[in-house]
């Protein structure tokens, strides 16, 4: 009987060693050598302190800052360990209520704004942790941020334009703005 089990056990041990140890170690070593910044989480530092990551959204609610997409993680917003969508379907009344509350909050923050609220500012992404908003989402907030910072709308629009990333290879994805990097650039302006 042991003769029949031996090949299976040897294969189990070999594959465990290869896929459980050798492959992860090799992948990590290659990532550390080729892409050290990304391998460490694409961390953003300010004055020597880590203030965030370009890969994860953060809650911003101060009028001086651009606000990102809503987080679907709860009870703590933007908690990586709770990453998931809200799983609320389009016909679920709770989704409609949440979107309406978010629209109302954005309108209250900029009562003079009459433009429709871009959908990415009121709906969570699939992961609930998206660090980006659309250029339309940024444009929707320009007046509020400019007023709160004492800048002209044209100045704030220039910041948005400088921080708008295009499509990958010119055709994949949509143009987007990293909210953390934009807010840090605005902080550095004055």
UniProtKB/Swiss-Prot annotation:
Its main location: membrane. The chain crosses the membrane at residues 10-30. The keyword Cell inner membrane applies. Keywords: ATP-binding, Cell inner membrane, Cell membrane, Ion transport, Membrane, Nucleotide-binding, Potassium, Potassium transport, Transmembrane, Transmembrane helix, Transport. One of its GO terms (cellular component) is plasma membrane. It comes from the Bacteria. The system is composed of three essential subunits: KdpA, KdpB and KdpC. Belongs to the KdpC family. This is Potassium-transporting ATPase KdpC subunit. It comes from Sorangium cellulosum (strain So ce56) (Polyangium cellulosum (strain So ce56)). The lineage of its organism: Bacteria, Pseudomonadati, Myxococcota, Polyangia, Polyangiales.
